[in-house]
Amino acid sequence: VGTYYLATVEGDQPRVRPFGTVLIYEGKLYIQTGRKKAVSKQLAKNPKAEICAFKDGVWLRVAGELVDDDRYEVKKAMLDAYPELRSMYDENDGNTQVLYFKNATATFSSFTAPPEEMQF
């Protein structure tokens, strides 16, 4: 998948950090983090977030609300997709957090074509 950047808000200050986990599960776009991290606390206060990725001259932005999904099955699916995370996370550890985008807009942009948008 590569790296993308997740933006959240802490008070009135934007916060951006690199992420690398992404999973389509039951037709929803999921990301993963740890409940102990600042990003988890920021999303609990304000679930609006945006991710941005760039590849081959095209950038993708996905903006929406991130919804916590505490089901064992989706946490296991995420960790099975990224086995290297098992040294830090486990679906039963109480720390592993998976979230999916809701009321989201994906925008594909480049310098050579008009932006394309889709809602999901």
Language-model features: where?
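A short, compositionally biased
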Residues: V1-G2, K45-P47, K102-N103
